[in-house]
Curated annotation (Swiss-Prot):
One of its GO terms (cellular component) is cytosol. Its EC number is 4.1.1.37. Catalyzes the decarboxylation of four acetate groups of uroporphyrinogen-III to yield coproporphyrinogen-III. This is Uroporphyrinogen decarboxylase. It comes from the Bacteria. The record marks 79 as: Transition state stabilizer. Transmembrane segments: none annotated. Pathway: Porphyrin-containing compound metabolism; protoporphyrin-IX biosynthesis; coproporphyrinogen-III from 5-aminolevulinate: step 4/4.
Amino acid sequence: MPFAPLANDSFLRACRRQATDYTPLWLMRQAGRYLPEYQASRARAGSFMGLATSVDYATEVTLQPLERFPLDAAILFSDILTVPDAMGLGLSFAEGEGPRLAKVVRDEATVAALAVPDMARLRYVFDAVASIRRALNGRVPLIGFSGSPWTLACYMVEGRGSDDYRLVKGLMYSRPDLMHRILAINADTVAAYLNAQIDAGAQAVMVFDSWGGVLADGAFQAFSLAYTARVLAQLQRTGVDGSDVPRIVFTKGGAPWLQDMQSLDCQVLGLDWTANLASARALVGGAVGGPGKALQGNIDPHVLLAPPARIVQQVQQVLDSFGPPHTDRSTTGPTHIFNLGHGISQFTPPAHVAALVEAVHSYSRAQRQG
């Protein structure tokens, strides 16, 4: 059964560097713990994995922020660690401790055993993508996603989140051959995973390189960027409805390497809050009618802990920092998708998110009419 036509394509237009009536926005982790309705769904599901592996719950939770806020895109509710879980590493979430993998990949034997998994093990994700597309009924586009090869490797070597990345960096420097083997398998797995999401109905896909910024210059290019490029080279260009599927790459802490990332085969580069939007636009945003990258970001998520009046001020600063919006509908030009610089804090009052969304839409409309 074909999916409903899209009523709001502002996000996809901005990804393609096409003019929009306002700056579109969505928020990293927009479906999450800051929403009381998410907490209720999670309680019913019994656990995070109970939510993520249930088509019905994943659909319900993905749509929750859209019921509250007029966001311009939905993002699949899932977790980047479903991929190593499918590789047989055993994902679990202990209360208050974050994700853990039961098995780690740190030596020749465990690296030799690593292989691209059968995507049937992730069928629950692809079924959720199709279910969410149907439930959205054309309201806004659906973004699929994966962790980057490097970010997944961090968890696969460390076994959990890390403060210093001692184990994964130690392996990278002492046995780069093993690290490259892990990353090559991860890249081919991520590509297959994202292609299956596209086949299921994802209208854009995003690679989260959440830990790329912990790498040294040189190491970033060799161990993160090269393998993100390997993923992008394998991705399908069109979705189930025949439209192109924009590709987004977000590297937390990646501002120093924007010029390197300009060569990536993607339409959009995500920025964290340490990046200067004006500088990024000048470096990679391109000119009207010419090639370039759309930019996504990059307000500090903790701005949302401030009173609404302060949030409005900060929103305006971000929009002003990007500079004059592209308005010529006859050609492409520099475009901006508003987002946070990383995931939303669980302590964020939902009313503050409403203030941010309203401020982005109203101020960016005024910019175009001014």
